[in-house]
Amino acid sequence: MIIESLFSSKNYQASKKLLDAATLRHEGLATNLANVETPGYKRVDLPKTFAAEFAARMRAGTIATAAMPKLTEDLAATSQRKDGNNVELDKELLALGKNVSEYDTLTEFVSGSLKQLRMAITGRTT
């Protein structure tokens, strides 16, 4: 019963989904960085609507059934370069740093939840 309640809690489910999304975003940002000098390359990222849609699902309590987002071409990104590549190294590095920080925070939350479960099962704190 305790185990079921932990893994079915809204916060835990949301954290898992956000970890998956952060992993996917990291892959996209890494791809952007790898293609910073590729002529014609267009940056990819999670859809701009992802955060709002995720928040709406949280409020509605339907986060467990949310589909995993897909990386999409960032149509809002403009190119200042003649070769058509719209990746800006500074912006990508900032986005990557922010994404890593968010991932670390989520990992700490999930890890803390699992530590509480282990403590409840074993009765020990270590």
Language model segments and positions:
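Amphipathic alpha-helical polymerization modules
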Residues: 1-126
